[in-house]
């Protein structure tokens, strides 16, 4: 398994495509090995789940508001009919603290994302040239990946 020794082909494909759809065996372990290889090559990495992202660009990169869960009967005198909106820092903000490093955003459970959300993820690296994205799209018998753009064109 030369891939697990160096990660060179994965690194080259990631640099070329900027967004990859990954299919890994369900027993796991492959993603952490590849993350370790990418860190060794100078990437700053961030791994998170794709569940509950909503608008990926806003949720990951911009300051945005959220509403806390409704906990039953509450007074509307203070907050109005819509409820209180809390400002939340971007989830992947720690990736953008250092401008000199390449950045790798790794999303688990990417199969829950819609076509439009995947298309938004494909557009993200155009704004920041050093940002690369890997989305795990499900299981496979062996570790394989392809361009996220090709995946969206062929699967939807």
From Swiss-Prot:
Q: Which GO terms describe its cellular component?
A: plasma membrane-derived thylakoid membrane
One example of the protein's molecular function in GO is:
oxidoreductase activity, acting on NAD(P)H, quinone or similar compound as acceptor
Regions that span the bilayer: none
Q: How does it sit in the membrane?
A: Peripheral membrane protein
Please give one Pfam family short name.
Answer: NdhN
Tell me the compartments it is located in: Cellular thylakoid membrane
What reaction does this enzyme carry out catalytically? Answer: a plastoquinone + NADH + (n+1) H(+)(in) = a plastoquinol + NAD(+) + n H(+)(out); a plastoquinone + NADPH + (n+1) H(+)(in) = a plastoquinol + NADP(+) + n H(+)(out)
Question: What keywords appear on the UniProt entry?
Answer: Membrane, NAD, NADP, Plastoquinone, Quinone, Thylakoid, Translocase, Transport
Primary localization class, coarse: membrane
User: Which top-level group of life is the source organism from?
Assistant: Bacteria
What's its EC? Answer: 7.1.1.-
UniProt function note:
NDH-1 shuttles electrons from an unknown electron donor, via FMN and iron-sulfur (Fe-S) centers, to quinones in the respiratory and/or the photosynthetic chain. The immediate electron acceptor for the enzyme in this species is believed to be plastoquinone. Couples the redox reaction to proton translocation, and thus conserves the redox energy in a proton gradient. Cyanobacterial NDH-1 also plays a role in inorganic carbon-concentration.
> Which HAMAP family does UniProt cross-reference here?
NDH1_NDH1N
Name of protein: NAD(P)H-quinone oxidoreductase subunit N
What organism is listed for this UniProt entry?
Prochlorococcus marinus (strain MIT 9515)
> Per UniProt, what is the name of the gene that codes for the protein in this document?
ndhN
């Amino acid at each position: 398994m030369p891939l697990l020794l160096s990660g060179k082909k994965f690194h080259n494909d990631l640099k070329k495509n900027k967004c990859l759809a990954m299919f890994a065996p369900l027993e796991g372990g492959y993603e952490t090995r590849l993350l370790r290889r990418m860190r060794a090559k100078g990437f700053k990495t961030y791994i998170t789940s794709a569940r509950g992202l909503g608008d990926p660009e806003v949720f990951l990169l911009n300051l945005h508001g959220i509403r806390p869960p409704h906990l039953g009967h509450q007074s509307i005198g203070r907050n109005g009919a819509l409820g209180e909106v809390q400002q939340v820092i971007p989830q992947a903000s720690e990736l953008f603290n250092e401008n000199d490093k390449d950045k790798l955003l790794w999303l688990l459970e990417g199969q829950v994302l819609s076509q439009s959300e995947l298309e938004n993820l494909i557009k993200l690296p155009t704004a920041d040239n050093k940002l690369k994205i890997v989305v795990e799209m499900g299981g496979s018998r062996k570790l394989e990946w392809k361009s996220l753009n090709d995946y969206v064109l062929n699967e939807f």
